């Protein structure tokens, strides 16, 4: 498959210009060069509030599983849609199986992401983030010189629509990387469309109302090095909810680390081997008027094993707006109408800190 690239319209290109992240040390290189790290070396990564909430055992809550094939079947769609409604309302998070993405597409993207992060630092730095851009290799949400840092490196790419791509950020090594990203991006975009159709059904609204809520896509490929010194004191990603409409995540290897916050406690997520993970984003919470909740989540670090993942963030038109959809005339509006650009700029201008960005959209007194 030939990878598409185009010059792009101003709106599409502006998506990646909504924020920036200050340059900081590469964590993978830090681990490789320092061996057993001292407290002084990783002081900026130590999270003081990491134990503020209890961590429950894995079996404390079974993450909902949604079978896409049941949603597509007339005989089972109603029952499966009820499960989807429950998952979005009570969890803001679910696993999706029989998602339709070919095994070879998933295998290829997993292999190429692993190969990319194994490349020498100087090769990866050829795709480093540039000031004023969200794309590229580096870190994210670093907005001050004194904030605590996350124990991870990443590469972020704007993938859909193709007019918004900047191919200078797309790695040429391994030589199959671009093609793997292209195929995976298209397949996940189709999955996001299917899920949005059924999410609309669960909200009793016309699918057309959600048709423009996944027109743009960012991919973020994350690498979480092991931390032998004090893995319980650092985080791969700080607690946050996503500023997207819908996020779809694929675990690259079998190393766990993702935790979701539910009922005030952290629940470790152990995905099914055949599942993708889906979480409600802030924009869907706003649009549903709080019926569906964006999930707060974080990533913990393993003492001896690396962890890798790829997240696909689906967002509406850059120039669009998100307004709460009220089910009845008596329903009280909990969120104000927000511009997509307006919310995105706010989200990317701050460090990750729970669901703080969403407070901006809540109406006063709520």
Language-model features: where?
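Peripheral, non-catalytic segments flanking oxidoreductase cores
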Residues: 1-366
């Amino acid at each position: 498959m030939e990878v598409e690239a185009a010059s792009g319209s101003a709106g599409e290109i502006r998506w990646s210009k909504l924020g920036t992240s200050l340059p900081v040390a590469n964590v993978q290189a830090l681990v490789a060069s320092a061996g057993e790290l001292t407290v002084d070396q990783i002081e900026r990564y130590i999270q003081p509030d990491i134990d503020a909430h209890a961590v429950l055992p894995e079996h404390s809550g079974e993450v909902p599983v949604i079978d896409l094939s049941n949603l597509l079947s007339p005989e089972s769609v109603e029952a499966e849609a009820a499960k989807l409604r429950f998952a979005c309302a009570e969890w803001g998070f679910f696993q999706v199986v029989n998602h339709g993405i070919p095994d070879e597409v998933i295998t290829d993207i997993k292999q190429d992401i692993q190969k990319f992060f194994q490349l020498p630092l100087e090769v990866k730095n050829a795709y480093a983030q540039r000031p004023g851009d969200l794309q590229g290799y580096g870190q994210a949400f670093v907005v001050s010189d004194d904030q605590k840092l996350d124990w991870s490196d990443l590469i972020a790419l704007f993938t859909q629509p193709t007019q918004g791509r900047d191919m200078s950020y797309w790695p040429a090594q391994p030589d199959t990387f671009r093609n793997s990203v292209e195929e995976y991006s298209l397949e996940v975009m189709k999955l996001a469309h299917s899920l949005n159709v059924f999410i609309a059904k669960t909200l009793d609204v016309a699918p057309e109302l959600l048709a423009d809520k996944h027109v743009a896509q960012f991919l973020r490929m994350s690498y979480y090095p092991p931390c032998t010194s004090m893995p319980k004191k650092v985080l791969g990603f700080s607690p946050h909810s996503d500023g997207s409409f819908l996020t779809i995540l694929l675990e690259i290897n079998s190393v766990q680390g993702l935790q979701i916050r539910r009922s005030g406690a952290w629940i470790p997520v152990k995905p099914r081997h055949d599942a993708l993970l889906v979480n409600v984003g802030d924009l869907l919470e706003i649009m549903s008027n709080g019926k569906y909740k964006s999930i707060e989540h974080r990533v913990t670090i393993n003492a001896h094993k690396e962890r890798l993942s790829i997240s696909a963030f689906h967002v509406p038109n850059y120039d669009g707006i998100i307004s709460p959809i009220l089910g009845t005339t008596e329903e009280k509006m909990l969120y104000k109408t927000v511009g997509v650009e307006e919310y995105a700029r706010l989200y990317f201008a701050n460090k990750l800190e729970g669901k703080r960005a969403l407070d901006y959209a809540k109406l006063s007194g709520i």
